[in-house]
From Swiss-Prot:
PANTHER family hit by this protein: 39S RIBOSOMAL PROTEIN L10, MITOCHONDRIAL (PTHR11560)
A single GO molecular function term of this UniProt record: structural constituent of ribosome
Family per similarity comment: Belongs to the universal ribosomal protein uL10 family.
UniProt signal peptide: none
Protein name: Large ribosomal subunit protein uL10
Lineage of producing organism: Bacteria, Pseudomonadati, Bacteroidota, Cytophagia, Cytophagales
SUPFAM superfamilies: Ribosomal protein L10-like
GO CC entries: large ribosomal subunit
Chain's role: Forms part of the ribosomal stalk, playing a central role in the interaction of the ribosome with GTP-bound translation factors.
A GO BP entry: translation
InterPro entries cross-referenced by the UniProt entry: Ribosomal_uL10, Ribosomal_uL10-like_sf, Ribosomal_uL10_bac, Ribosomal_uL10_bac_type, Ribosomal_uL10_CS_bac
Subunit structure: Part of the ribosomal stalk of the 50S ribosomal subunit. The N-terminus interacts with L11 and the large rRNA to form the base of the stalk. The C-terminus forms an elongated spine to which L12 dimers bind in a sequential fashion forming a multimeric L10(L12)X complex.
Length: 167
């Protein structure tokens, strides 16, 4: 790979990192071609972009964006790495868990950047999968706002029924 090709890849990765709210780093080494194709199709169906990139190019892209990536320098940026880009924080984590349920251990979660916070290690995958999306949070707020009104309506209906029985 020439320096020009590397510079283009660094620029692409930097743009994707800057444009996405979330990126995950995975290890897909040892996956068969069929497994990689199935994983890419699943990513595409969920709106997640998956790209295999050399660790040195990932580091240079992060440096270009002035992002302190020291938390990722350990296990996250060692070995083969694939990047997953998403605007929803929990979708890549849920996608990885769903793919693993099919009996495939790879790709392994190595680390993630969610809204500029770094999460490194396999033990963080469950926590990332449990993060609620914007739509889920809005649904929870609407349900909380509707609950008092439903209680008032229920109370009024009950009182009118009691009043009708007495009359």
């Amino acid at each position: 790979m020439t320096k020009e090709e590397k510079a283009i890849i660094i620029q692409e990765v930097a743009q994707k990192i800057a444009g996405a709210a979330t990126f995950y780093i995975t290890d897909g080494s040892g996956m068969t071609v069929d497994q990689v194709n199935k994983f890419r199709k699943l990513c595409f169906s969920k709106g997640v972009e998956y790209k295999v990139v050399k660790n040195s190019l990932i580091k240079k892209a992060l440096q270009q964006l002035n992002i302190d990536h020291t938390a990722l320098n350990g296990a996250a940026l060692k070995g083969a790495s694939g990047l997953m880009f998403s605007d929803t924080a929990n979708v890549p984590a849920k996608l990885l868990k769903q793919f693993h349920k099919g009996g495939v251990a790879k790709p392994e979660f190595k680390g993630a950047s969610v809204f500029a916070d770094f999460y490194v290690g396999k033990d963080k995958l469950d926590a990332l999968a449990s993060i609620k999306s914007k739509e889920e949070l809005i649904g929870d707020i609407i349900a909380l706002l509707q609950a008092p009104a439903q209680r008032v309506i229920g109370g009024l209906t009950n009182e009118s029924r009691v009043f009708a029985e007495q009359a």
